């Protein structure tokens, strides 16, 4: 990401799935595709398409670990964009934390092998 404009960020975050991905990563730090699919109740191809857009925008970074790809928010997000994401998280905090609790109950987060195998 060389330069993220406000209109680009708002277009990206206007999609409910992309916003959910960003807020979950803001809450948990890092998740694999299968965790995101489970958390957001979306198919792997749909989540992967959204992750690609987020990665191309520079909002996300990924790392491979074996056959899994883990995603996290980029530390290079402009400060103004990070503030917007943080405020969005504050507005959706209860919803995001409920999703996180559900993910933990399904034993996905932290042990992706249960879902990702």
Swiss-Prot record:
Record-linked CDD domains: HTH_ARSR
Residue span(s) of domain HTH arsR-type: 1-92
Annotated GO biological process: DNA-templated transcription; regulation of DNA-templated transcription; response to arsenic-containing substance
Highest taxon, organism lineage: Bacteria
Underlying gene: arsR
Name of the protein described by the UniProt record: Arsenical resistance operon repressor
Keyword Repressor tagged: yes
Subunit structure: Binds DNA as a homodimer.
GO molecular function, one term: DNA-binding transcription factor activity
Chain's role: Transcriptional repressor for the arsEFG operon. ArsE is a trans-acting regulatory protein which controls its own expression. The repressive effect of ArsE is alleviated by oxyions of +III oxidation state of arsenic, antimony, and bismuth, as well as arsenate (As(V)).
Residues annotated to bind DNA: 33-52
Gene3D superfamilies reported for this sequence: Winged helix-like DNA-binding domain superfamily/Winged helix DNA-binding domain
InterPro entries xref list: ArsR-like_HTH, ArsR_HTH, HTH_ArsR_DNA-bd_dom, HTH_MetalResp_TranReg, WH-like_DNA-bd_sf, WH_DNA-bd_sf
Pfam family, one: HTH_5
Annotated disulfide bonds: none
Keywords linked to the UniProt accession: Arsenical resistance, DNA-binding, Repressor, Transcription, Transcription regulation
The keyword Secreted appears for this protein: no
């Amino acid at each position: 990401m060389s330069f993220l404009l406000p209109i680009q960020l708002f277009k990206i975050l206007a999609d409910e799935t992309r916003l959910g991905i960003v807020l979950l990563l803001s809450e948990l730090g890092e998740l694999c595709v299968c965790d995101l699919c489970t958390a957001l109740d979306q198919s792997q191809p749909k989540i992967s398409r959204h992750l690609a857009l987020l990665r191309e925008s520079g909002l996300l970074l990924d790392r491979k670990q074996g056959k899994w790809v883990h995603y996290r928010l980029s530390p290079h997000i402009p400060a103004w964009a990070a503030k917007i994401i943080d405020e969005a998280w504050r507005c959706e905090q209860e919803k995001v934390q409920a999703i996180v609790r559900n993910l933990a109950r399904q034993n996905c987060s932290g042990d992706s092998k249960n879902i990702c195998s």
